C-alpha cells in the first residue's frame, strides 16, 4: 500500500495475542472472530493449547493467523539441550530482557542458539498449514536489533511479509528512536507493517471504554489494536497476567457499541494480508 493510500483511509487490524496459551484464550478468539470485530490472532507454537488453537484456526478460514514468537517469559520450542544458554532447567525463557538483550548482542554462541529457536518456531508454524499473516514477538522483543535482524533474515525463508510495529501515540520519548530504527529496517526489507498500535499502555485492560476512546480519536493510516481476551475461568492464565481483565476484553470485542464506533470512524477491518494486498492465499478482502 502506498503512503497516499494509507492517508486516504483508516484501516484497523484487531489482533488477539497469545493464541494457544490456554483453551480459555482459544475459545475467546473463536467467539470474538465469529461474533465480534476480531480479525487476527497471533499463535504461540510452543504453548500448552497450541494444538487446539491450530484446529480452531483451520475451522475459521477468514481468521488471519500469525506467529507470536516467544523469546522471553515463556516456553521455548526446542528442548533445553539444544539451547542451554537461553532457557532454565524447565526449558523456559526468563523475563530479564535487559540482561538477555546484552547477551544476544555480545555473545556469538547465544546468538546462534537464538537463531535456532527462532527458526524452530517459524518451522513449527509452517507445519500447521496455516498461511502466515504476520509476525510479532512476546513483549515486543523485536525492538532489540539482534532479535529483529534474525527474524527478518529467517522470516524470508518462511514467507514473512508483515510484522507489528509497536508504535503507540503515548510511547515514551526515549523509545521513539528505537521505533524509528525498526520502521526503517522493515521498510528496507520490504516487510509491511502497521502505522501505529493501540494496546501497549492499556495491556490487559483493553475494555469497551478504552476501545471506544481509541476509536473516537483514530489517526489516518493502518492501525493494529491488540488485546488478550479469554473466557472466564478459575485462576490467572500466567503469573504475569494476574491483573488482566481478559473477560472484559472479550466483551469489548463483542460489543455492538465498538462495532458501531468502527463504522462511525469510517474504518475497514482485516488482517495484515488483507490490508497489504496479500490476500491471494485466501482471497478475502477487508470487511
Enumerate the language-model features and the residues they cover.
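Active-site histidine-anchored catalytic micro-motif
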Residues: 137-139
